[in-house]
Amino acid sequence: MSIAITRTDDLLTVTLEGELNILSAPELERALADELETVDSVVFDLTEVSYITSAGLRVLLATQQAVQERGSVIVRGACDEILEIFEMTGFDTILVIE
């Protein structure tokens, strides 16, 4: 998995490429750890993500919980398969899906 993080003021943009699974989720957690306390919202660009497992969903949920008092988590560019997973798990009601 490739992870690119950019910050603009209080907005963190996380661009991912590959599969967000049990192997890559801890790497993403480590990459986000220092940033989440100082941003209001996080945008996940999933345009190049081909698959997400429960471990990946857990990272998205933990991110939402970390910023919910100040802002939100926005997901952009998710493919139909990932959108279906969000709908089946109720994540489409927790996250902002664009």
Region annotations inferred by a language model:
Residues 96-98:
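Short acidic-hydrophobic, aromatic-tinged amphipathic segments that line or gate anion-handling sites
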Residues 22-94:
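Amphipathic alpha-helical interaction surfaces in cytosolic regulatory modules
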Residues 2-29, 47-48:
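STAS-typified acidic loop motif
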